[in-house]
């Protein structure tokens, strides 16, 4: 494989480098050392050529209503099939993954965004929450609804962060 191909593959394995290339804010020499795929000057040249082929980094606002719902908990949703209570809980679950459901009755806060949301919007929100050092307990997106579950004390900050993230979601 060529150095250029190795460099592109290394960039794709490190999305933050890819975003920085698209945004035009990358220190090429530092990135070349970080990627460690060959001689620094040659990798710098490969990065510059790759950057020329990439679309510019752009964001767009998403129209969504962001709300907060307190008193949620994560529960094992594998109760006996057909029992009325379990069926009701499953229908009321905000999020269900791998047999665990986010339902009423706990100390978590769910932040919901409804409207123009998708996986890219969720990724943007999760990136910003990670930078803000807000631990996310659970998150998901489906059918124009995004949900992020956090500890109760992090709820208000999470609302603000999600709203801010939705105001500038990176384009593909």
Language-model regions, residue ranges each:
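Terminal low-complexity, intrinsically disordered regions
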Residues: 1-54
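A conserved regulatory-domain signal marking ACT and ACT-like small-molecule sensing domains
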Residues: 6, 48-172
